[in-house]
Amino acid sequence: MPQTFHAPDGTLIAYDDQGIGLPLLCLAGLTRTMADFDYLRPHLPPLRMIRMDYRGRGASGHSGAASYTVLQEAQDALALLDHLGVKKAAVLGTSRGGLIGMLLAAIAHDRLLGLCLNDVGPVIERAGLTRISDYVGRNPAARTHAELAELMPRFNTGFANVPPARWLAEAQKHTTQTDAGLQITYDPALRDAFLAGFQGSPADLWPLFDACAGLPVALIRGANSDLLSQATADEMLRRRPDMIATNVPDRAHIPFLDELESIDVIHKFLEVVA
């Protein structure tokens, strides 16, 4: 069972804190939970792994669409570190979690030991956002985990060589079986928050990436990603030639993090920040 604390505004935040040593704060994707990092965990060296469910996701409390923002989630992450008495942490951010990590570099640079980004960068491709908008906040049409697992390869284009057991695990982690069918594991109001941020011209996020100056940075990119282009990854590497980076074959958005290429980058990143 996860532990909990209350954010400054009173919202219940669920988290998991296990191990000793280097603190690694793991921040999940937009609609996902701390379970995002279950596949990676057995491959990590001894360290202190800290995970959280953002407000409105998983076991955390719901606080309304207006509060489901990257800034609020960054503030909640800092509140969690304060609650745990952690002065500095390395951050591993998947998708939305990487955006939070870059924002933390800008607003709380002294709290970070480094940032490892999983398939996200300063330019978010419209194609990926459009795909996400098709499903965010909606319960799947599939009625069972097994049925959803069978459909996942069709919906997750760009993935190959993924065993059926992995798709079933994904279905079980990110939906709940009920008598009425499968239910999403987050507040449906997240859709309103996402669509509100989807409107208008995209924000310039390069200043957030540049705010990582002085911190070790690593990048894991799904070779077939529709959210992070190769051109953006190349520009990130041009700005940070010391960035540890890889493309993960047979993966789109997002790599599972237990691929050999992902594990290699994460281990190298941890060696640098340790």
Q: Can you annotate each of these PLM segments?
A:
Residues 41, 50-92:
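Active-site loop/oxyanion-hole signature of alpha/beta-hydrolase fold enzymes
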